[in-house]
Each structure stands twice: as C-alpha cells, then as structure tokens.
Amino acid sequence: QKEVAQRLPEKSQDETEAQPSASRINSKLEIPVMLTKREEIKLQRTGYTVSYNNFYKTPNWVAWELTRQETKGSEERKNRFVPDPDLPEPRVEHADYTRSGYDRGHMAPAADMKWSKKAMEESFYMSNICPQNQKLNRDDWGDLEELCRSWARKYGTVHIACGPIYDKKQPKRIGEHRVAVPDRFFKVVLIYNRKSPIAMGFLFDNKAHHQAPVSYTHLRAHE
C-alpha cells in the first residue's frame, strides 16, 4: 500500500494579511486526482500541496492557488534549500545538485510565496525541486511563472499544477541520493473565476533551446 502523508499548515504570526482563508485550504480546486500507479507521498504546505515520489526523488506534481493579494507580498527569498523534514530518510539534500549542471528548479516558485515567511521557507524544501536545465529554468519556465502572476493580478485568482515527466524507464540520476532528471515538464493553469473559465496546458523539454509559445499545448475554454 502506498504511503500517503498529510500535514495541514499551521497558522503563523509571520503571515501577512494575505494569508489563505479557510475556504482556500478546504476547496483545493487545483489538486489533481490521487495517483494509483505511481508512488506518492502527499504533503500539504502553507502555500502549496506536493505529491512526492520517493523513487524518482522528485515531486509527481505540485499544486497551488495564487491570488491577486498574494502577488503583493514582500517576503524576500533566502535561497536556503533544505531537505524536507516530513519525508522518510534518506532525503534529498542541497548538495545532490552541486556541480551537476542542473539548476535546483522550483515547481511552486518562491516568487509566488512572498505573502508568508513560512510559505517562502517551505518553497525551498527539496521536495519542491527538480533538476532543471539552467536555461529553461531562467528563461522559458521563469517567463511562464511571471505570466501566471500577471494573470493572478488581472483575474484575481489562478490555480496552477506542474511537475516532471519521465519518458525513460531508467532516467539519468544525479547526486548521492540519485535524483532522477526529468525529460520534460508540464504546467496546467486554470483561471476559473470569470464568466468563461480558461484552462491552459504547457509542455517543456528539459533542454537549453528556446521553446516558442506556439510549441506549447493549449487547452482553452470559450472566452
């Protein structure tokens, strides 16, 4: 039987007035269905939920809601990547990525967690990180993250889920803890609180070349 761990976020005195409401925590419109054919440890954080795969040592997916108010947060990132304390040992560490040639690529981006000190700190848990091509992480992937924030500011709320895709049965591994390197990444964005909801899906190869928007997979409802 698959191990499924759940931890509800504790309220923090460090959270700003933009902290999530009870309705946000309970609704979780962005959460994918539970996996049945893949190892899964599900953990609910202050700002996101992660389905972690202990075989690949990366998430299956990470999902979160981003609101207009949360984009106004001022919490600064500290770049302190740490093992996830709620995962079984041995745990992925910061050093597993050192000199690997890959970035420590956030799934739920730190810039989406500026509304809470705790949310910001938890975004640097290694369970929220994947080996990501440096150019992809800093260009196309980062550009889409900024687009999502602009949509949150425009529409009020966006629901986001993303994660790695492994095309090979035996993917490349890095580090002492043998972290699997994804072949691709997906991101799904839902803008629900409008007359005609919009859903968009994006696929990125884990490579250095620029991937123009026309190569993405788009799923859009009638506007």
Residue ranges and their predicted role:
Residues 1-220:
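Domain-level detector for secreted/extracellular nuclease and nuclease-toxin modules, and
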